[in-house]
Curated annotation (Swiss-Prot):
One of its GO terms (cellular component) is respiratory chain complex I. The keyword Transport applies. Belongs to the complex I subunit 5 family. It is found in: Mitochondrion inner membrane. Disulfide bonds: none annotated. It catalyses: a ubiquinone + NADH + 5 H(+)(in) = a ubiquinol + NAD(+) + 4 H(+)(out). Core subunit of respiratory chain NADH dehydrogenase (Complex I) which is composed of 45 different subunits. This is NADH-ubiquinone oxidoreductase chain 5. It holds the Pfam family NADH5_C. GO terms for biological process: electron transport coupled proton transport; mitochondrial electron transport, NADH to ubiquinone; mitochondrial respiratory chain complex I assembly. It comes from the Eukaryota. The gene is MT-ND5. Core subunit of the mitochondrial membrane respiratory chain NADH dehydrogenase (Complex I) which catalyzes electron transfer from NADH through the respiratory chain, using ubiquinone as an electron acceptor. Essential for the catalytic activity and assembly of complex I. GO terms for molecular function: NADH dehydrogenase (ubiquinone) activity.
Amino acid sequence: MNMFSSCMITALVILTLPIIMSSTKLYKNKLYPYYVKTATSYAFMISMIPTMMFIYSGQETIFSNWHWMTIQTMKLSMSFKLNYFSMIFVPVALFVTWSIMEFSMWYMHSDPYINRFFKYLLLFLITMMVLVTANNMFQLFIGWEGVGIMSFLLIGWWYGRTDANTAALQAVLYNRIGDVGFIMTMAWFLLNLNTWDLQQIFITTNDNFNLPLLGLLLAATGKSAQFGLHPWLPSAMEGPTPVSALLHSSTMVVAGVFLLIRFHPLMEHNQTIQTLTLCLGAITTLFTAICALTQNDIKEIVSFSTSSQLGLMMVTIGINQPYLAFLHICTHAFCKAMLFMCSGSVIHSLNDEQDIRKMGGLFKVLPFTTTSLIIGSLALTGMPFLTGFYSKDLIIESANTSNTNAWALLITLVATSLTAAYSTRIMFFALLGQPRFSPMILINENNPLLINSIKRLLIGSVFAGYIISHSITPTTIPQMTMPHYLKMTALAVTILGFILALELNLTTQGLKFNYPSNYFKFSSLLGYYPTIMHRLTPKTSLTISQKSASMLLDSIWLENILPKSISYFQMKSSTLISNQKGLIKLYFLSFMLTMILSLLILNYHE
């Protein structure tokens, strides 16, 4: 057992070596990215030892060996929880990151600050490892905030671009909203249970956990880009493609779902929170799938697809299947990271062109990338015996056989069908058909850094689902029995999506709209959500502020109180006081009459 924990710690410590190295002269070395990639690959290989031990023994462990501080009666110590979730997630994250780092060496080779880029990627990976192995909420919060700040730095990597800066700020602001929920939960546990240790929280028999669980759901909504706090994820595509592949597909965005999986002992008997999670996930998965249908930017489509899959994971947690949600996290990481890397390969080859309308015919010039992209898309849609099938098929079956909300189930099935539709659209427009890009572009994918990294994830996208689902069973799962039509639902829905997408792609190629349809506008403008939230709300508040500040105060009160009131009172008083009308003849006549009368009176008086 000592070997189990020490191997795991060794794997995590190896990752910190290049960070320490960055304070020496080696940081200026051109080989620094290579050191980082090698450290990650060694960490992955060493982390496989405890994972294999765990698979065969099934023994979870917690070790707490560094007392940090005591707050009144609560002891804060650094403790790691190596259970099913962290033991499987760590090797998956390390494997995906290793491939992405190798890909980055090709993609970012001309960047002058490539060493800093690799250091950021590694720091992100370390904070992610802290998050998944944490045994108390404080340590989990450190990892949670760590991935948030690294996300900000990496999205805004090209800080000379306004869009990148805006997207980075947007990601931070949306995540702050989620963090409010996390901090509220931490405060509740501190006040009511006087502990942040996960074991102590789980063994308490407090019936009313609604408030902290709502806080956790808000935190997960922010981090995992669920409906309401979702716009930051598509905007995050402004970052370099390796960042999109690592943070916004396989690791960081699943942190919110991972948080709910960690706290599932509190959620499993709470009907209210489960229903909320189910409905939120169902709305997200459908809404983002609809948005993905009409996008033209290849990275935007893949990012909306990520958001849709996160919604599906939330649905799985909502039907009380945390282990299944976790399996989907692991299988999704492989195919989604590969999809982003293939997109990056296409974008780089076409001189940074991201519009799928300006691609086409790439299967002839980029055969390896095309093959990988098609296999990744099929794995994502749940093609039988590829990675995605093992989790996605089970999720649909579990939803079909559980006493769930019929509305949520229906829209989840529709979203699953749409997954096939937008995946077909990418394949159809970007890879097949006639070339629509400039013939002057030189295309070359024969770089070992690119080929090897995608190849590893390609193998993962084919076999990982089978390996993870068959060699690692959390508990003895009883064999499910269900009618044939229910068993085939997931597959039927996916095939329906494929057929519809192909039919629509082929029939609408020559069609031209005289005016855009409202449905099309709804999808391409992302359901008007950014327009309303990012434009209408600030504009309304600014207009009201301006009206109250300038119109109400300046134009009305200040003018009326001082200049206008003074002149008004002056005019009134002068009008009242002076009866001078300027009639000289009349005044002279009255003066003469008065004089004559007075003289006459004086004369007669004598």
